[in-house]
């Protein structure tokens, strides 16, 4: 019996030793396992870090009774994040449904994702490996397989591009005062009765008032004289010219003491021997018998004599024409042309500061566009909104100014007030940018896509959203051809480094935030152009010193981390 018990213990010990030696051997030889990580340096796109790991096991490495669980973990200062799934592998004798690695060797391919955090820039990707054989478990210890995360996609500029509502202020507005002098048939003299007509009296008074009004400037006077088309050209041509002379004489007398009337080209005369256009217009407005027939004659014949003959053949209709239509055509039309001159920009600003209530809404909105001081601009638009509560433009512009001041919540509130007055594409665009700056990408996209017609601004906003989603081709298309930092960033992220560089180089003015200069430095590093990299990195730091610390941990510059010039630049 003692022999049997000793024999059993010996067998059990041998089994345990065999299990342990299998695990220990795998751990000891774990350096023979090869790992390939794609990308070699992790990157964040669309707010996540994706990784592909390919592991290759040599022959006679994987114990056939062992199950191995590999857990990818990203470790960084202050914490760590485990990827969303693990990789389980098993030897060929294990009864389970995991990936089998035989004694002849094998491989696996793993893909996983984690949400990105800023702390992950300087990090290590490790595999934590646990092996199980029967009831025995052995941790192999972490295996480092990659360094850090490149976070260039997070540089996307989410600053808003709200659309200001324009004023419709026009400083100079043309105005014309009209009057007619009518003549007896075949006469060119002005009947004294005509000069007492209401329109003539009003014209005289208008000329006097304008001549002493500094806000109105006399520009010109047009005199157009006509003869009715019921006579011959031989009679009507000199007749219309004589009527022009009498009308011209009359109107010039009214300007006799006004200096501007002495300038060359102030008076313009024109004569029309047969006023067929006027005839047609008067007939169209009338209810005269045979109206349609008369108009048909005009459309069928262009010869004045034929027209006259055909119309005079309509006996009853012609009698009506002689009394109701033709007398209206024997006339001289006078038009005094004036420019109404509004306030200058300087006057608008002065009045806005003194008493804005004396300005109309267009002048108030104009005032807002004349100052570069955002706080003063806000004050002007608030006054415009207070005095014009039904005009959405004032509230909209308040919102735009608040966004420029970094007060996004208040800006959104103003856009909502504007929306309550008039919900249009401008408001949708601006609410979209308000949501984008606040980080509500889904809401921003909803606003932009709800617009009746896309604008360059809304397409820009959709381009920003596309970058945050990792849709770089779409972003490039949305941004269009206008050089911008975000366009260059999208080009770089999609792999078109040369075009990204040319886009940045063609920008007329670089943002004082330093982002364009910093991206240039990143491109310089990518192209291994040390001088280009350093000069632009220094420029970025000159704009904003924070880029020093950022560059220190940016793996875009990994190849230069030991370079003395780089180190001195970011110290």
Model-inferred region functions:
Residues 2-513, 520, 524, 529-535, ...:
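N-terminal targeting segments with Sec-dependent signals, encompassing both cleavable signal peptides
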